[in-house]
Amino acid sequence: MTVTEQGKRARATLAFMSQVDSEQKNKALNAIANMLEKNSDRIIKANAIDLEQGRNNGLSEGLLDRLMLNEERIKAMADGVRQVADLADPCGKILSEYKKDNGLLIKKITVPIGVIGIIFEARPNVTVDAAALCLKSGNSVILRGGKEAINSNTALSEIMRSALDEVGFVKDAIQLVTDTTRQSSADMMHMNEYLDCLIPRGGKGLIKAVVENSTVPVIETGSGNCHIYVDDSADINMAARIIFNAKTQRISVCNACESLVINSAIINEALPVIANELKKKNVQIRGDERAVSACSLVIPASDEDYYTEYLDYIISVKTVDTLDEAIEHINSHSTGHSEAIITQNEANAQKFLKCIDSSSVYVNASTRFTDGAEFGLGAEIGISTQKLHARGPMGLEQLTSTKYLIFGNGQVR
């Protein structure tokens, strides 16, 4: 089946999706969760093929980690689907209601976007998370994953579609594009007749290609060149603990810290402590001249390092003399995802919060919290780094649009 034919099928589901109620959606989601757990052996076997091919093709440790599914991760996916089922239905909410002098009653309500296309890379959990969120928000979804995860994604999509069929829910609300060539992605980018929105999830190259070439409206989920600034008033032990978590807890995710910015007044004392903590996970530290001088574990960085989302056990260090310099450096090198300041100075914290132009800004906490579940949104479709429609973790509410309902009694203009 071509991508265009899948688009037609997805469009044909909208009559059903516009009338489905919360109970039906939740029944379908719980059926998906149960079916995933019941078929964990099948999923793991399919995933093993992808992992073997990935190793043979030289995928990095970070990408293999993103790709890997085991019983624990499958259970987590199933539990995530159940959590989405437990969330309030985002559709049909009355955002405003007022009566005009002419007697017209006007209501503004939330409605599904329609058909959403998602192009992503080697993360099979996206297949399940995205499908669950789209279904709960009343949207149909066409999923196009990377070739690295095709066997895993095929198994997951077939299982989810079977679950929908079992409870009488239209199964074409979830479709997977099995053609992993660039042509299928290119086709989706121009399916304005069938897709209402396109969401890319992956590295800079994928996101850039979709944003620059798509005629379908795009919600951009940016890469994560996340920074932590260590202020001159920082608690050094707290800073080391937060940085260790933000960098090493899971290197392959977009909210991992990739770059440190350290005030020169504290660098000689702070950087050796931070570096020794990072050494526990063999993190390579690349820094400027002052960072290299401050700590023997630091090697020289290039200009390119400060723009790089490593997704690996590597971190860059930039030395600054002032908070203003730190803010300027971060805003000019960040991807607009997540940044943090470690400080005991309230005025500096407030200035950082106001001046940093990213979707999520932290004071004395790890950037790893930028996540739909951690924010109480349930699973997420991605982290939006743009400013229109959605910004930050995209949960159910961000997958809705609005509609005006106008009630009259014979009024004419």
Residue ranges and their predicted role:
Residues 22-26, 91, 170-174, 249-256, ...:
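Flexible, glycine/charged-enriched surface loops at secondary-structure junctions
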Residues 122-125, 129-136, 163-166, 206-312, ...:
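ALDH superfamily catalytic-core signature
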Residues 302-413:
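Conserved C-terminal structural/oligomerization subdomain of aldehyde/semialdehyde dehydrogenase
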Residues 1-106:
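N-terminal Rossmann-like NAD(P)+-binding subdomain of aldehyde/semialdehyde dehydrogenases
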Residues 86, 95-237:
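Rossmann-like NAD(P) dinucleotide-binding subdomain of oxidoreductase/dehydrogenase enzymes
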Residues 18-19, 232, 319, 342:
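A structural signal for short, well-ordered beta-strand elements
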